[in-house]
Amino acid sequence: MDIFEAIAVTQDRLAQEGADLAELLGHLRGGISSALIGEREWERVLDCARELPITMGAQPFGFELPLHDRRPRADFGASLASGNRSGDFFKERARGGESDETSRAITRLFAQMEAGNPALREVVGRKLMLEYDIGSSQDGDGSMPGLFLRPNERTLFGGAGLDHDVGTAVDALVSCVGWEPLAVERRNVQRVYLAQPDDTRMDSFGVFPSRERSIRLAIMGFETPGEVRAFLARLHWPGDLSVVEAALTRLNERTGVERTGLNLDVGAGGLGPTLGLTPIVKQRYADDPRSWIDGLTDWQPLLDALRGEEWVVAEKIQALGDWTSKPTTLFAKTGRFIMLSGIHHIKLVVAGDRLEQAKGYIYMVLSGALAV
């Protein structure tokens, strides 16, 4: 049974368990520390999840947690794919009386994957990730989520001449949310790709329709702080390079950072001043290149290293360290499910001339195929 068949089996079973994702989350609340997500914040997450189908529990979902903020807030993320129950839910909503901007954007994107733009599917496959601003939103007005594509079918290594594929992914995201195409924005994103070292890869493309326009890029695989600095200098990133290099050097002194990822915001005017740093300490990659979860990382050394940063909340670091666990068996009406959970990544945020934020990203995913 391949990964898509396993997801389909799990979705069929979840559909018999309930209707919306909030019903599933209600059963999982006991495993999430109140230091990470408070009760009032949890209710806001549930309000969002009530608009999503329970079948999305068969693909990774989880939370973005601000480790620098004592308030127990969280943003929410979930995954779906064209051609299965989760994607069909949004297509049906777009055709029906409950159509909304999000379902229409998803339907337009899936139409490109399935028929209109086969080149897109050859790069990113047929999955999509959504990121909902909840804890970070001022008013929680139900605005559109961020939409993210990952090039899982074709790895976009630097130096491989794949700038056309980069443009294909950008075009798809821009058009699906109804933005006007901007040639200079597209060229700027391709310029970032062309500046990548050969052994780095373009890991994801994202847009946030409810924020100021930009293309969010994730680039993984930088080996040293010096390599990061040189890359950012080539692109004329408008921040303080010494702050970036110093932050990575401090972490290297406390623990062995094997690779580093970067998050950049790219627009028609060039690169934005906010930069995300994703240190990776030790990783085992998944056997299936189409896996929804890249691999298993030993995050504890990095969490221990972050304790040395005075602005990081110690209680949240402790709670995050407790999050990684072995597979858990859940018992439901249709039988057993296996739940996998863990830390997906940790990101440090540099804004211009200072390191000011740390965020933890945790995931959960259920399988009803492993348990039958």
Locate each region found by the language model.
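Extended, well-ordered protein cores
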Residues: 108-158, 162-224, 228-241
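Edge/loop elements at the starts and ends of beta-strands within beta-rich repeat scaffolds
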Residues: 69, 140-142, 208-213, 217, ...
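An N-terminal, globular interaction/scaffold subdomain
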Residues: 2-129
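Extracellular/lumenal glycan-associated surfaces
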Residues: 74-81, 143-154, 212-225, 274-283, ...
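C-terminal structured domains
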Residues: 224-372
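Surface-exposed polar/charged interaction patches
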Residues: 31-34, 52-55, 116, 176, ...
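Short, compositionally biased low-complexity segments enriched in polar/charged residues
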Residues: 35-67, 119-133, 194-206, 261, ...
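Extended intrinsically disordered, low-complexity coil regions enriched in Ser, Thr, Gly, Ala
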Residues: 80-108, 157-178, 223-243, 289-308, ...
